[in-house]
Amino acid sequence: MNKRKLNAVMQLHGESQQNLADFLEMSLSRLNAKINEYRGAQFRQNEIAAIQEHYGLTAEEVNEIFFASFVSQKDSNGPAA
């Protein structure tokens, strides 16, 4: 899950996480759990499709956000000092 890219898409459309939570008809805390993959929480296929349509995302953008393995700069440079 590339939460930075999802947040960038939301900002580009002038929306907050609360706006997306309302659109998906879920609580903000549940949305945050899915974005942060807290305790294995993940977006369902229908939620990903709804987000894709809502923001007009391409299939490639959906893959980059939800399916591509994302390594932060800190992680790729080894352990934090």
Task: Walk through the language-model features, giving the residues of each.
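Recognition helix of helix-turn-helix/homeodomain-like DNA-binding domains
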Residues: M26-Q42
